[in-house]
Amino acid sequence: MTWKAGMKERVLRQHIEGCIDQVQEYVDLESAQAISSFESKAVDHFRCLDGLKAQYNTREDKISEFKRLQSEYATKVDGLEKSIEHFEKLSEEIEEFLVELEVKTKLASKRQS
């Protein structure tokens, strides 16, 4: 290899390295801008999502409240059913008592006659 050829090769390598450096700087700059843009959009989307969560979170609260009320009403219905059973038994006992009282009243009136 001659001196001129070696010199051209060295200049060519320097030129290629310069091009590589410029391409790397361009890639770094574009990457940084893309990352910054992505981060900014992600932050905006998370803010929007937080707003939507706050706006529609009541739905979960309402479901939870509905389940709680449903449980309370089921408990009250059970209590009412027990009360109804108790009063039905009491009614039967009162009817039996009235029948016995009627019989005793008839017997007492026959004795007096």
Curated annotation (Swiss-Prot):
Pfam families linked: BLI1
GO cellular component, one term: endosome
Keyword field: Coiled coil, Endosome, Transport
Coiled coil: 75-108
Domain of life (superkingdom): Eukaryota
Compartment list: Endosome
Similarity remark: Belongs to the BLI1 family.
Subunit structure comment from the entry: Component of the biogenesis of lysosome-related organelles complex-1 (BLOC-1).
Protein name: Biogenesis of lysosome-related organelles complex 1 subunit BLI1
Species this chain originates from: Lachancea thermotolerans (strain ATCC 56472 / CBS 6340 / NRRL Y-8284)
